[in-house]
Amino acid sequence: MMKSISTWKQELTKGAHAARLAALYCCTPDETPAQAARYAAVLDGLETTFGAHTEAGLYSAPGRTEIGGNHTDHQHGRVLAGSVNIDMIAAAAPNSLNQLRVQSEGYDLCVIDLDDLTARKEEENTTASLLRGECEAFRQRGAKLSGLDVYISSNVPKGSGVSSSAAFEVLVGVILNDCFMDEKVSPIAIAQIGQWAENVYFGKPCGLMDQMASSVGNIITIDFADKANPDVEPVQVDFSKAGLALCILDSGADHADLTDEYAAIPNECRAVAAVCGGEVLRDVPFETFLANIPACRKQCGDRAVLRAFHFYADNDRVPQQVAALREDDFDAFLQMVTASGDSSWEYLQNVIPAGYKEHQEVAVTIAAAKHYLSGKGAVRVHGGGFAGTVQAFVPVEMLADFKANMEKILGAGRCHVLSIRPEGGAVL
């Protein structure tokens, strides 16, 4: 929705969007001025970077938390995930250059020509590749693309396991959908577009869970058995009523040089599936996998076999977690969160990058969190693993001490206490 920049600023200052912002950020209307100021700041950034514009739109895409199903999505498995109340926001306005120009705070300006949307090998692992890929996906869906200037600001920590990359992809998708498709593309399709751009243009073999959680929003369970039409179901749950706080612990490690570690997981799982006659592990019954373990060990190696064991167990846990949440059986839910985390460390092996000795930040974070929880709540590696974050469900009466103790180890501001956001990618 485009409005004049002066109108946006007046409305934001006067609190005209307080109710909307309160819903997006899980706070009271009285607590929204800080969020309104963020949107006013991206409008300022848009004009400072690109010059005066007559009108602009405002957009948001949330980070996500993976609650169940660690590395199951790329094997067409099940996941449990939710959007959270930290996000990436943008102001976007038309330009007459037939270029998509994107300025993210703290990064270099990125410009792509909308007349040339072909994938470029030399552009892999760059922001330009994601932009080019998403624009091409919208063009294929009938979008009449034209020049656009975008200014982005984020409070989603980069490389933190809350999935800043998915939030970026969803944000761009929401903008293109609003500006060129009258919001006709569904949240599920926007997620699929982001994944396609990341796989084909960016060159990273990712699953679909991150994009789906950010785009669809709230808590959802997704079954990717039919990859083209994943089954998405809402799961109504209020962790605060259970006396639990959701904490995301930033270990301080960075994903930057770990693409090969991430890629090895889906590659090894697919290799096991191939030995067993499938494309992905979801194609292969567990009994068939068991019968083929000797051949899998020989052809794929033992780590691949262990990763397959993790997939089957964590994939089965997801519907059990959903059932427990729907029945308000939080004790059973927490036991399964713990079991998932143990499986990720022991079998999936995505806590410590291969060969790392001095730097094992995620492992230290898990060990410290378990110590301070003293058998209460639950702790698990969060998201892709190897670096980034750890998820903890913390009894609210322990939260203050837990946060203080963890930040003594990790550093100030490293324990994020989050809420589940009720909406995914959004046009303000």
What do these predicted ranges mean?
Residues 101-103, 147-154, 184-196, 334-339, ...:
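Beta-strand segments within the central parallel beta-sheet cores of soluble alpha/beta enzyme folds
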Residues 78-97, 216:
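Structural signature of FAD isoalloxazine-binding scaffolds in flavoprotein oxidoreductases
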Residues 83-85, 162-182:
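DPxDG-like acidic metal-binding loop motif
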Residues 135-157:
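Glycine- and acidic-rich phosphate- and metal-coordinating loops
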Residues 182-230, 235, 340, 366-369, ...:
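Alpha/beta catalytic cores of group-transfer enzymes, especially the acyltransferase/condensing modules
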Residues 60-76, 155-171, 375-393:
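Glycine/serine-rich anion-binding loops at beta->alpha junctions
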Residues 1-64, 89, 93-124, 221-380, ...:
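C-terminal nucleotide
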Residues 140-148, 176-190, 396-409:
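Phosphate-handling active-site elements
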